[in-house]
Amino acid sequence: MENLLKIYDIKEEELSELKALTPARICVGRAGTRLKTNTFLKFRADHAVAMDAVWSSVDEKLIDTLNFLKVQTLAKDKEEYITRPDLGRKFSEETLDYIKNNCINEPDVQIIAGDGLSATAINANLRKIYFVIVEKLKSRGYKVGTPIFVKYARVATMDKISEELNAKVTIILIGERPGLATGESMSSYMAYESSTKKPESQRTVVSNIHNKGIPSVDAGKEIVRIIDIMMKEKKSGVELRI
């Protein structure tokens, strides 16, 4: 460690400040050619957290408490969801009919939550961010759609739901592929008139939503700010200047 600091002319206090800003492994040092024991054990523990985030399930009580309509993609289980990403983007015709018949049609903003690759992220962040988004949207006079929870969801599920309900802006709050220190990281993908006929570049993203990244409450405020711009400009993704 001392050799690294000398080589790169880094002061100890500067390194401490950098480490305080990120959970990433910075200047962890080595014991000979191997990682130090504490570093190796922390790596194994963080890897286990990431694995748990992928294979865990979203708390059903949380979804029920927030009154989300619950649906599932064509993926039968978690293993198929992981090995067949295409099935996580599709719904059966029965499910699409169920969505259309049980949700508000033509909303200004349609909110979706999906487990994605980290159910842990949804469990940790959904409650706070959802209330912030809904409260601020309604205070601005937007017609907010029936919230929908999608089990075994990929981002593209937002396109099918948007088309079915004819939503102006659709957002999906989804658990992201976990890193070694960010098992609770969630992202919000947003699009104006989201459609399966449009490219992925139609989407605007707010990512890294978790306590050590962008806190849920702050992320919720930023999401609504972006939605305001989308509604005004009638576009999203790479076409939108935010």
Curated annotation (Swiss-Prot):
GO terms for biological process: amino acid metabolic process; ethanolamine catabolic process. Pathway: Amine and polyamine degradation; ethanolamine degradation. Binds between the large and small subunits. Keywords: Bacterial microcompartment, Cobalamin, Cobalt, Lyase. Its EC number is 4.3.1.7. It comes from the Bacteria. It is found in: Bacterial microcompartment. It holds the Pfam family EutC. It catalyses: ethanolamine = acetaldehyde + NH4(+). Its main location: other. Its cofactor is adenosylcob(III)alamin. Catalyzes the deamination of various vicinal amino-alcohols to oxo compounds. Allows this organism to utilize ethanolamine as the sole source of nitrogen and carbon in the presence of external vitamin B12. Belongs to the EutC family. HAMAP family: EutC. The basic unit is a heterodimer which dimerizes to form tetramers. The heterotetramers trimerize; 6 large subunits form a core ring with 6 small subunits projecting outwards. This is Ethanolamine ammonia-lyase small subunit. The gene is eutC.
